[in-house]
Amino acid sequence: MSNPTYQYYNQLFKHLQLPLAYCDINLLEKNCQDIALRAAGNKTIRIASKSVRCTAILKRILDSNPIYKGIMCFTGREALYLIEQGFDDLLLGYPIVNKDEIYDICTATKLGKKIILMVDCEAHLKLVNDIAAQVGVIQPLCIDMDMSTDFPGIHFGVLRSPITTVTAGKKLIDCFEQYSNISLTALMGYEAQVAGLGEKNPANGIKNFVIPFLKKKSITDYTKRRQELVDYVKSKNYPLEIVNAGGTGSIESSKQENWVTEITVGSGFYSPALFDYYSDFKHQPAAGFAVQIVRQPKPGVYTCLGGGYIASGTVGIDKQPKPYLPEGIQLTANEGTGEVQTPFEYSGSEKINLGDTILFRHSKAGELCERFNELHLISDGKIIEKVPTYRGDGKCFL
């Protein structure tokens, strides 16, 4: 499909209060369809809420195709908030140790909600078990297996779970026998070095040449580890309901693992700028933000109000918002995207003036919603609705 033009968006936005964030529903629906096709088979897709951060969009994705089932949350309070909003089947992607949060989640479990807590050490098990005993419930848990691979001189992956070996995983699995108020119902392994690392990112320079090789070797490594731990859990007769894997960038490899039951996807729905740099897939730029030209300091240079919405992670040029439309925008080396104003050099063919809009895409997906109270939903050339983000609902979970 052909993406909308600059004038398509400019006419929609130029008379509104700017900056604003938007989601193009036509492109979002296309992404939902394409992601479902990539994952088609015998697995479901769990939505990573941190990459969406808007309940209206979460509902749209869940309703778009039966393959979308359940949400991976990023904090306990977010999970409880989503329960209040009518969502269920929630998997926390990260451990929590706040006793009040755990107590409230155990209480929700007792009331019939499906919330699975993440653990990666015996201290987590004991903490949740003690609180679940107070509540009078058996709380389901998920073990986070580290999927990183160590090569000579290179740690290829992230620093998350201490369950880095099959032996460590078996040891933690055996610990469940000591506790009566927790149950092992899920395993998760997020292969960040495959799912979240593009092969064509200009900021990575010469590293791009070796990344595909490292990915291939890493997939072989962690696939074997994941299978061994799944087999071990089954040998212990635990009621394993979920084996969660993947991310937007590793759907194809994760779906090849027969023991995996579901794949988590998040960033692919909005398809932010960092997801332009993958070799094997391309999704549509469904979300972004619009700023307004308010100055022209000299010929060929314009300045917008706002724009400095920088992504998390290691500091780098690829964490800046990426100019989207019109084509021909070059950020200045001295200022980049600014706290209050963003200057840029322009060499494009579109005629632009004071009051016109300039479109950017955030480097990451859900973080866009931390800077705006609402998303303007666009469909077929019209703004059809304005929906609150988490921030617009008065929520700030991290």
For each feature predicted by the language model, list its residue ranges.
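Generic N-terminal amphipathic, Lys/Arg-enriched alpha-helix
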Residues: 4-23
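N-terminal glycine-rich anion-binding loops that anchor highly charged ligand groups
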Residues: 3-8, 27-57
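Conserved, mostly hydrophobic/aromatic
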Residues: 28, 50, 82, 143, ...
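Active-site loop/helix belt of alpha/beta enzymes
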Residues: 147-271
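C-terminal accessory subdomain/extension
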Residues: 296-398
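Flexible loop/turn segments at secondary-structure boundaries
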Residues: 54-56, 82, 194-197, 250-253, ...
